[in-house]
Regions:
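Intrinsic low-complexity, intrinsically disordered or marginally ordered coil/linker segments
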Residues: 1-170
């Protein structure tokens, strides 16, 4: 099965003493993954590394840390090597205000909103606007009935931020 094969290759990389390719990220650098899958890391943008992966009930989860965004070239390469696999991702790059997923139906990444109470609960993720608005109303101490109300309240305050998670085609 393709999922098991990819998982085995990730384990192989993780257990290596030295990376397949020289780099400053270690054995789980995305370039090493591209190499072990038969690709050329010089032709695929690989700026990042895998920080965690697990296989449970036939679902392979891979968490990466990358620079400036989701590594779509690596993702597309993996899908080319394993045509039966579909990779769903969630990308969060706070400094660039990027919050997006390709999981249109929310099977793996169902959250569509983030509320950040920097002095309280921290970042909270929400699937539905009603739940978000109820939480934000309590945190901000004011009644918020719409997303527009929330945007206005966040604009007028310090210590709170709000982000909608964009669903992208890919």
């Amino acid at each position: 099965e393709e999922v098991q094969d990819l998982y085995s290759k990730l384990q192989e990389l993780q257990n290596m003493e030295e990376p397949l390719e020289p780099n400053s990220w270690g054995t789980l650098w995305l370039g090493c993954l591209v190499t072990i899958l038969g690709g050329n890391w010089n032709e695929i943008y690989c700026r990042g590394h895998i920080i965690n992966f697990s296989l449970e009930d036939g679902i392979l989860s891979i968490e990466t840390e990358t620079a400036w965004g989701e590594m779509d070239e690596v993702r597309h390469f993996i899908e080319k090597v394993y045509p039966a696999l579909k990779i769903y991702y969630y990308e969060e790059e706070c400094g660039c205000e990027i919050y997006q997923t390709n999981d249109r139906h929310g099977h793996f990444f169902s959250s569509r909103y983030i509320f950040d109470d920097q002095d309280g609960e921290g970042m909270e993720y929400f699937d539905k606007p009603e739940t978000l608005l109820a939480f934000a109303s309590r945190a901000m101490g004011k009644k918020l009935e719409t997303i527009e109300d929330l945007n206005d309240a966040v604009d007028d305050s310090e210590g709170f931020s709000f982000h909608e998670i964009k669903v992208v085609n890919d």
